[in-house]
Structures are given as C-alpha cells and as structure tokens.
Amino acid sequence: MKFSSLSVIGLGYIGLPTAAVFASRKIKVIGVDVNQKAVDTINQGKIHIVEPDLDIVVHAAVTEGFLKATTVAEAADAFIVAVPTPFKGDNHEPDLSYIQAACQAISPVLAKGNLVILESTSPVGATEQMAQWLADARPDLTFPQTHDEQSDIRIAHCPERVLPGHVMRELIENDRVIGGITARCSDYAVALYKTFVQGECVITNARTAEMAKLTENSFRDVNIAFANELSMICDKLDINVWELIKLANRHPRVNILQPGPGVGGHCIAVDPWFIVSKTPEQARLIRTAREVNDSKPEWVINKVKIAIADFMQANPDKTTKDVSVACYGLAFKPDIDDLRESPALSIAQQIMTLHNGAVLLVEPNVQSLPAKLSSAELVEFETAFAQADIHVLLVDHKAFKAAKPSHGIIVDSKGIW
C-alpha cells in the first residue's frame, strides 16, 4: 500500500502539523482550508499558528513543492479530516457540521481505492456517520458499511493525541490508535501513518478508537476536578492547598494534580461532554467533574471581587474606577498562543464586565487581543507589575515564574507567586 498523495482537510493546530510532517516524507500534500488568509500564508511558506519547529518544516515542504494549500479539495490517494467538532449552542451537544462540510468538499473528487480518515475528536459513531455522508454523496462508489472488505473506499478513525507546544515531536513519537470500519480499512490507515509514526499503531474498531480519545481526556478531567475541588475545600478550611498536595503526593500511590482557574482547550474541556451526550444516565461522575471544572472560573472571579473590596477598604480615598486590575495569561495552558475554551480568557472577560476601572491583560504569546477583549489593554508584564493594584495570575507561563509583583494584592490561581 503506497500513498503518493494526501489531502488534509482543515489546516489548524492539528491539520497543518500533520500535513507538514507527511510532506517532509516526500508525499505530495494538498492542504484544504476555508480560511483564505491561512491558505495564502501557508503557500508563502509561513504559518498562521504558533507551534515550535512547525515553521521550519512548512517552509521546507512548500519550497520543495511537497505542500500546497487551497480552499478547494483536489484528488488524492488519501484524505485526512482534521476539522473542529464544537458544541451546538449551549447544550453541549456535539456539532458535526464541519465534518459534514468536509465530506461535501471531498466527495466530488473521491475515487475507487481512496482512504478517508477522521482525525477530529468525535462522539462515538461519528466515523460511521461520515462514511454514510460520503456514501450518500457518491452512490457510484461502495463503502465499508455496506460492502465490508470489498468496498471501493476505506474509512477509519485515528484520533490525534499530541500536546500543544510539542506537536512536531509527539506526532512522530506517540503511539496511535487506529480504528477502521473494517480490518482492511485499519490496515490501509496503518500503512499511511507508518510513513512517519515511530510509535506503535494499535488497531481496534472505529467506535472504540473514538471512545479511547474521549476516555483519555475524561480521565484527565476527573483528576483535575479533584484537585480543583480540593482547592476550594482548602480555601474554606484555611489550608494551603499547594502545601497539602505536596504532602499528600509523598504517598507512593498518590499523585494529585495541581489546581488552577478551570480547564480549557479544545480537548479536555470538550470531550467529556461527548460521552455525556451519548450516555447521560451512566456518565454521572464525568458530568460532575465537568461541572466542577466549569465552576472554577466563577470561584476565581469571586476572589478578585474580594481583593478589590479589600483594596478599597485599605484605600478609602479611592473609588473602584481608580483600581487597576492586571490579568496574567489568557491561553488555555502555559507557553502557547491557543485561547480556545480558555478559562483565563473567560475570567478576564468577566472581570472587564464587572470592574469599571482599568484592566490590563498580559499574554506574552499573542500580539493582539481577540475582539471581545478589545477594550482592554495588552501590556508587557513589567508594565502590569508597575501599574496594577490587583494582580490575577491565571496561567503559569515561564515568563511569570521568574518575577513576582512587589506591591498590590495577588490572586494566584496557579500557586507560583
């Protein structure tokens, strides 16, 4: 099984690195995205996201002619769908419309012998749904859900499991779970990924592969929820949670995670709801963990309100408009520029709403603020240290660990100050 060309649908934080790594192995890669600006940037050999070493690989792949980007799908031997799977509205129901749109984009150029892989983190059954959408669009081709191993098109699910900031290494080194709709589909998918994957490609079926990714992130979410709930308990009991966790973790079989302002990102804050949406009666612990982590930003905001009140009491000559609040960090985790599902971003936004004084935002990994924060000021952390009265640490970026505000009231959600 040899693949000389590949199309990657979706050139975001997962799609672009995946496309670039395949292209670095001298496979002709066509990247497809609806964002014309991203397409133009990539075709110049540049990148529109922040990921260490990605720029070097993309530049080389484009320069050598192995990677190009376009807004219209083209024929290829294999297709990887790496598009978002957000929620529908506020009810935590998975929205598969991006996957459906990807199917509509590639169906006209599908040909007998093609492999289609869904990489997007998805609820159980999404790969089968994708296969059905493709079958409906191309009745002239056969698909594995009806023709088993004899199908014209092979379909599989292979969830990504990489850490932002380490994507280029982990894409290559990490094990991959590969779930074909049939065994032959799995074999074709393994052959494709073995182009660059040095980790083990573990074969299962599509539904189990989908559930594996959701399980990994739900497990992490539950453990984070324990730490976050513990931090709120300790606050009530006047106990230093950071010291407590250090002591408890001296037990050889205890490994409590570090609490924070909530849980963010496009995986841990989202994936557990995909399980809950399918099995609401059974997923009680998973739902509760999500609710605990989703409640933590409000707890942090209450701490900020108390800090402002304490400052006002200590400075009776000032009004709230005179009080300056600095928020340190907007990304969903340290040392990246990804603001998706970020509790820090949500907290900063709510502080801007409730506080009528100056709000300074410090995020060393972005050059500009999203539109919903445009009324705030993006500043260097030295400026915030000097000007702010209330210092709210939300993300433990390396830059923030090296220094600490010398005056004002500190609200530290990460325990580094």
Where are these regions (language model features)?
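Structural/interface elements that position substrates and couple domains in central-metabolism enzymes
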Residues: 1-417
